[in-house]
Amino acid sequence: MLDADDFEAWFRLLETPGLGREGARRLLAAFGSATQVLQASKAARQQVVGPPRAQAFDTEPEELSTRLRAAQAWLGGGEGRRVLCIGDDAYPAVLLQTPDPPLLLYVQGQVEFLNRRSLAIVGSRNASAQGLDNARAFGAHLSQHG
């Protein structure tokens, strides 16, 4: 499980505009952790992802701290909420088999279920009201039937 400092480092790494997941993956492979990526010199990061992507760390976007506080509030806002990074023991093995697994997972509920046989409902980050209603209805129906 990530502590508060590790979560902030992961969040900053993944929310840096212009870096992308591929850039984040390369930096993580080179430096070992999100915290070490942020502690690395600009020159060291440039060697891994090139100058334009490395420069993305020079300025922190204004909205980053607002989004970070919102994510932290979500984490502290209910029982069973946590964040798993791709190296976490509880990270779902099946996701590691996909071409581009998420580097962070926001989880609510019992993490031990993540490695059981399951069904995923995949949607949009910007779902319509109807789409959200449909997802809730599908989820409720499926959970009632095991």
Give names to the regions the model predicted.
Residues M1-H145:
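Short, positively charged patches
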